[in-house]
Amino acid sequence: MSVRTLPLLFLNLGGEMLYVLDQRLRAQNIPGDKARKVLNDIISTMFNRKFTEELFKPQELYSKKALRTVYDRLAHASIMRLNQASMDKLYDLMTMAFKYQVLLCPRPKDVLLVTFNHLDSIKGFIQDSPTIIHQVDETFRQLTEIYGSLSAGEFQLIRQTLLIFFQDLHIRVSTFLKDKVQNSNGRFVLPVSGPVPWGIEVPGVIRVFNDKGDEVKRMEFRHGGDYVAAHKEGSFELYGDRVLKLGTNMYSASRPVETHMSATSKNSASRAQENIAPNPLAKEELNFLARLIGGMEIKKPSGPEPGFRLNLFTTDEEEEHAALSRPEELSYEVISIQATQDQQRSEELARIMEEFEMTEQPERNTSKGDDLLAMMDRL
């Protein structure tokens, strides 16, 4: 497992979340000023300096449930509210989109180009906010600094770590089904056409070399596909042609997107013990979430500003039906964490929590550990 996977996972899933929210904000005719505020607030929180400092520290991936909690907090960083069914659908769309992109990356290193495509599109949402653009550019700089010198083997390990994280997710997405890139069982269709990875020859020739490295024989074979050579490599600079289209906004055509549980996904969920049994890493995940969420400096509006509810379904009835029909094993509504009273750890977490503005409820006279668990209950 690579300890450099988390930033790529978080940024790409966050980019997909913004694509979906932007599409739904437009579909529901939310006023432009409110829609811009929602996206600006979420992006500003997502690229907050303290948050990214914690994010880029070498660390292993945690459970889907722990990461889901972070995105739930992130999606509600502004005046917009999502109910449980819409949040479930949002997370399903995010994860399946990025899983598809990781599967189709021509080279393991190209997951970095996918990330840059997301960052490029995110900057398009905040063109009138130079301060937030600077935050995104600073994250780009961190990415190039950390990942620019990694070997092909290290990128392969990152890709394998991502695929292991996604391996039990087989949720059907209407866009993928219509484009015939996903089967009815929720599994993706790998193409046998298109450009090969940069620097790789089109398949069809086998060369045999002797012990001196000289070619002594050449044979041709039919590969059964329709491959072409890549005309150029995507740019890894701040500005440039990424060439690769994976990670761009697939909702720009403004078509409704639906998700459905496949039988495979339901069966996988029933076997996923992390959702129904106590998590042995609960204490570590609590610390992880406290550090990440503690870095989310969410700014509440100074004056009274009415919020609104966003529905990721066409109608309220569909949303209610989705909430009732979703398998219980796939619910992320409750995270149960049992933390022991370790004095040094409690003091450290309490210090982190002091940096996190809690304005929803008045402070109560409780212990530091209880304050932290109460915060987790309110997520």
Curated annotation (Swiss-Prot):
Localization: Basal cell membrane
Alphabetically ordered keywords of this record: Cell membrane, Membrane, Transport
Annotated Pfam families: Oscp1 (PF10188)
Highest taxon in the source lineage: Eukaryota
GO CC, alphabetical: basal plasma membrane; cytoplasm; plasma membrane
Transmembrane regions listed in the UniProt entry: none
GO MF entries: transmembrane transporter activity
Tissue specificity of this protein: Predominantly expressed in testis.
BP GO annotations: xenobiotic detoxification by transmembrane export across the plasma membrane
Keyword Cell membrane: yes
Function: May be involved in drug clearance in the placenta.
UniProt protein name: Protein OSCP1
Lineage: Eukaryota, Metazoa, Chordata, Craniata, Vertebrata
Gene it is expressed from: Oscp1
